[in-house]
């Protein structure tokens, strides 16, 4: 309902998960499998000025929460990606999403970690190997893109 109601998808994570966020936001905004109308999505991992100023001025643990506070609105969807489920900045970003009335979802691995307490739905890749978890996150993200295109009647 997020997209159908004029909302957007905000994705965030660290390291390889940040790259996954950027990849998936691009698949949604530009195209996945076919030319179609855009799906509003943004990776909160792309603005180096916001990330470095935030890390310096308000602490790295708060960088995604602050961006969600500024850019999010009720009805949006925040997707946090963490291979461990333990990334405090991702957890705080998801909490902030819930606080503003947005939905909070998560992709993780390694048993899930505390992200499970703030994200629903919450997809846990049953592996302790970071590279396998990241590969599955991209696969899950591609499945999400395809499902959205079909559900929204865009392809």
Predicted segments, located by residue:
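Glycine-rich phosphate/diphosphate-binding loops that line cofactor/substrate pockets in enzymes
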Residues: 1-9
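Glycine-rich phosphate-binding loops that contact phosphosugars or nucleotide phosphates
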Residues: 12, 17-154
